A protein has these predicted regions:
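Single-pass transmembrane signal-anchor helices and their membrane-water interface zones
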Residues: 1-19
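Ser/Thr/Pro/Gly-rich low-complexity linker/stalk segments immediately outside membranes or between
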Residues: 13-34
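Extracytoplasmic/periplasmic/luminal assembly and interaction segments
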Residues: 34-87
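Non-cytosolic head/periplasmic domains of membrane-anchored proteins
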Residues: 85-168
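Extracytoplasmic/luminal low-complexity segments enriched in Pro/Gly and acidic/polar residues
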Residues: 169-176
Length: 176
C-alpha cells in the first residue's frame, strides 16, 4: 500500500504543471514545466510553430536544455540573425521558484529580454490565443488604449509591440 501511495504521489508530482516558459523569437513556443523543471508539454502559437515544437522533441527535457534547443534551432537562429527580438517570459505558482527560473533563463537567453508573469496569466493568455509574452504586452497596451485587441497584438512581432507601446507612452506623456 505504501509503494502504491508513493508511486501515485510521484506520478502526480511529475505530471502536474507548476510553471511555464514562453519563448517569443519569430517562432512562438510555450513550455509547460513540472516541479522538477522538466518539459511536460510544448505548444506553438501557430501550425508552423507547432511543427517546430514537434521536430525539436522537447518533452521531458530539462527546461534549460529545451530552451537551448529552441534557441539553437535553425528557425529561431535565422529569425534572431534577421533582427527578431527574443522575449522570454516565466510564470509559476511559487514566486521563489519563478525567480530561480528567471535567473537560469537569463543565462540561457543571453541578449533577449526576460520577464515574469503571474500564474493566472498563463490561462488568460491561452484564452486570448496569445503567448505569455504577447499577453503581457496586450495588458500594457490596453492600459494606455483599452480599444486594442488580442487580434491586433497577435499579428505583431515583439519589436512592433514594443514600438507601439513606446509610441503610446510618449503620446500619453505628451498629453499630460
Amino acid at each position: 500500500l505504501l509503494v502504491v501511495f508513493l508511486g501515485a504521489g510521484g506520478a502526480l508530482a511529475w505530471f502536474t504543471p507548476v510553471s511555464a516558459v514562453s519563448v517569443e523569437a519569430g517562432p512562438s513556443l510555450e513550455l509547460t514545466l513540472n516541479r522538477f523543471d522538466r518539459v511536460l508539454q510544448v505548444q506553438g502559437n501557430s501550425a508552423q510553430d507547432q511543427e517546430l515544437a514537434d521536430k525539436l522533441e522537447l518533452s521531458y527535457l530539462s527546461y534549460t536544455d529545451a530552451l537551448e534547443a529552441i534557441l539553437g534551432s535553425q528557425e529561431v537562429s535565422q529569425a534572431l540573425d534577421n533582427g527578431t527580438e527574443l522575449a522570454v517570459t516565466v510564470a509559476g505558482q511559487n514566486q521563489q521558484h519563478c525567480q530561480d527560473l528567471m535567473e537560469d533563463t537569463q543565462s540561457c537567453a543571453g541578449h533577449g529580454s526576460c520577464s515574469s508573469a503571474d500564474w493566472s496569466q498563463v490561462t488568460a493568455a491561452q484564452k486570448e490565443g496569445l503567448s505569455l509574452s504577447k499577453y503581457q504586452m496586450l495588458l500594457q497596451l490596453q492600459a494606455l488604449d483599452p480599444s486594442i485587441t488580442s487580434e491586433q497584438v497577435s499579428e505583431c512581432s515583439m519589436h512592433q509591440l514594443r514600438q507601439w507601446l513606446s509610441d503610446l507612452s510618449s503620446g500619453q506623456d505628451a498629453s499630460s
